Curated annotation (Swiss-Prot):
Modified residues (Phosphothreonine): T354
Ubiquitin-like domain span: 24-99
Organism encoding this protein: Ornithorhynchus anatinus (Duckbill platypus)
Protein name per UniProt: Large proline-rich protein BAG6
Chain segments annotated as transmembrane: none
Gene name, Swiss-Prot/TrEMBL: BAG6
Amino acid sequence: MDPGGGGGGGGPGPGPDMEEPADLEVSVKTLDSQTRTFTVGAEMTVKEFKEHIAAAVSIPPDKQRLIYQGRVLQDDKKLQEYNVGGKVIHLVERAPPQTQGPSSGGASRAGSPSAPHAGAPPAGPRGPGAPVHDRNANSYVMVGTFNLPSDGSAVDVHINMEQAPIQSEPRVRLVMAQHMLRDIQALLARLEPQPGQQGQQGQQQGQALLAESGPPRPGPPGQTDGETSPREPTETREPTETREPEDGVAARGTGPAPGPAPAPAPEGNAAPNHPSPAEYAEVLQELQRVESRLQPFLQRYRAILGAAATTDYNNNTEGREEDQRVINLVGESLRLLGNTFVALSDLRCNLSATAPRHLHVVRPMSHYTAPMVLQQAAIPIQINVGTTVTMTGSGARPGPTDTTPTSGQTSSPTPSPTSGEPGPDGAPSGPAPPQAAGPPRLIRISHQSVEPVVMMHMNIPDSGSQTGGTSSASTASTGLPGQGLGQQVSGFPAAPTRVVIARPTPPQARPPHPGGPPPAPGATIPVPGSNASLAQMVSGLVGQLLMQPVLVAQGASGLGAPQAPATASASAGTTNTATTAGPAPGGPAQPPPPPPPGPPQAEVQFSQLLGSLLGPGVPGGPGTAGGATSVGSPTITVAMPGVPAFLQGMTDFLQATQTAPPPPPPPPPPPAPEQAPAAAPPGSPPAGPGGAGGGPEALPPEFFTSVVQGVLSSLLGSLGARAGSGESIAGFIQRLSGSSNIFEPGADGALGFFGALLSVICQNLSMVDVVMLLHGHSQPLQRLQPQLRGFFHQHYLGGREPTGPAIRRATHTLITGLEEYVRDSFASVQVQPGVDITRTNLDFLQEQFNGIAAHVLHCTDSSFGVRLLELCNQGLFECLALNLHCLGGQQSALTNVINGRIRRLSGGVNPSLVSWLTTMMGLRLQVVLEHMPVGPDQVLRYVRRLGEPPQPPPEEPMDVQGAERAPPEPERENASPAPGTTAEEAMSRGPPPAPEGPPPLEEQDGAAAAESEPWAAAVPPEWVPIIRQDLQTQRKVKPQPPLSDAYLSGMPAKRRKLRSDLQQRLRADPNYSPQHFPNAQRAFMDEP
């Protein structure tokens, strides 16, 4: 597929002088992603053009190689003959002598035929795998793209990743933007009038990566959405540029090599490659040019859409097809343009820094999705920087003749149903059931710098066998009952990535390299020891996965589920993980170990998945599917959505995943100080309905803890968290904020109670405990029982006996103290007419806190932690549903309330941390609110209306200065869901997943609310009490009733009569209840 001639075949050539203007505007793009536009005479020859641009590109004319549509421009021909006017030509520098091979890791990198990529049939020669000159090196793209052989041959690819330090996220952003702009230009080239051959070239250029015209055919865009989608074509082409595909490029100086090569690793760069503001300005200029070119088509796009509803195309098929083409291409251009704006919008330049200044990002890529995960089709692999990686491509048996496209990204292989059959290279991955679609090919990657070795397998079906996936998968699963298959999310547009991590058995701990004959099978039952190194391996992976939405797939015996597409990505920041798509890796002749638990119980927890790493050989344990004894290496299987949440949204994913029997684990907590407290006491995350399951028995708590610590070190490393330490939340926050006492425990009233409670929680729980709580483990709360019980007895009841009346009186006193904070929290949002939001929240909090306090004071058995977690989760979701109902279903209003409280609470915390927290909370909260397990009808009983008599206080309120109950529930709510990316999982479970308990956040809210109003710092101190009093006075003004006298007096008699008729009908209807039909009650029954 790589043969260059293919796609661009008709390109240059031939054409007799095509009619071009006297001057041509030609854009030249070098491999350092700089694009320069030159206006030259149409009669200028290629050689003259090289001399013309030599000074600008800093490459002597004799070393320049201009490539257009996959062909090298010949010096003696005129530019006009190539029809390059308004197009982009790629410029590379002639390859250096072969003696200058890379200095590390690449055995075959510099020598012989550049990187021997597993090539499809020696499809056309390729240029050198790694040009040494940094101009030809894309230091920002860590990707190997290669063809898989269909004839069973195996080739090793060694990639030198030493340029890791050179990677710069601002540079990545600019490169992404330039790639997307280039894709837009390619789309525009298809929209603009041009010779007929151009269209064909555009179709073929998907394989000829350098070609300008073919990037975004329907395939790539459809494959992925979001920010990575635009990169699909770009990544594909990025390496290609360097490898100068197409025939002509073979002349590049090194011997031909089959298939495309991975992005070359620059040798020359030694310092961080941060872009300068001028480069940003150039990209913006290019963006402006693209927008201006797009403008006329955008106008036509609007015109087509404006008339689309009624236009008759019955007798105008050609017109319909043309209009449809415009809609599709302009729509795709808008998507790319939007992603370009997203990529560029976070770039900033600090003018106060010393010159020379460079760009930095204010919001890391992980804010949107996993950084640099290439998610387009065949085998985009992001390899960990700083490690030497050996990749072996092996075909199973000679199957269908077609091979994966050269670009490795232009095709979208369907998930392969089973693990590969023994490949000719002698590295069988396990028995494969009969397949109708032909044996899958297998990619194996081993990180040689990690102990234990992590094997990475990818099943890749032949391009020709891209059947529905579901049918082949079902046959696979039925054929192999003992092999658990990742549970496919039904209805999800593209199957999520399936990651299988295997810990090889001891005899295979260090295979010479995956391509050669593997060591003798040896013992197939893994040694349970070395949990530390295994935990380190898994924690790195999980740390990355927690940065993005994740669905943990459970293998269900007998369930036919398509495997996920073969896309694998390893976080660039994680040094000891390998992720894969496909069956469980393992030694030769080992049956693929079943993925996590197969039983469709709703009590599956994250720990059980990790437990499968340790207990695959235990009959009926979590490591076996259907109770079959497994002798394979332990594995953990995780399915990841392939679409970044920041653009695509997780709606489809969540809706689809709700059909999966086992609920995925709850979200992990964001490493923010404010968040941590929220997740603290009752504030624990969603827990699976059942706590037990096979996981806990197979997984020692120490192992889970070590994994979590590794995850935290990956998540919080940038915040200076000490990995593996039992640092308490309080210590972590204090170290982060520089404050010695952030909770103000000495205050009076409710503020004092909650400040003290929060201090107790944060001093006794670590971030590891919080993560465990968020994953449904109640052990930390169970461990905290004595402290909580003593604290409530002392500070809540004042030493009195914990009788029912005493608890109710204490709760009343406590929650009443929060009235001012609740009112203040909702002061800036629009509440439903007639609803008393303050009393609604106070009564709700009082009832919830009554239950929590009674449980803390009365429960003495082992169910303490589990029940407390359930109470907190239930309270959180009911609070969210209640306030969402009171705000008229306006999610933005609820988000504003929560973020406002967070900002007030975080007065002394690093602003960037607060910004990150509010943004993350908002994203997670939106997901949670869209899939609330609690409906409005379940919380209507808590709604209080203006004018209703208040509830009588319990007999004589306690004089003990109780504390207050949490202010607006919303905050804590936001806290729990916001944590971590697995929030979607929590939601998709449907059971009662809800992070953290109400009390913690609320208290904080109240505390901070009083002290740090946003406006308080902007006015003289003596004005603050006066302004506060005015605010309170204004809030007491009664809202106008729903139907005013003015409205009624102006109402036509007929309508007035209709209203009275409806009132009579409602009064006579035995099924009518104001509680069930509040809108009808308000509209027709309430007297104005």
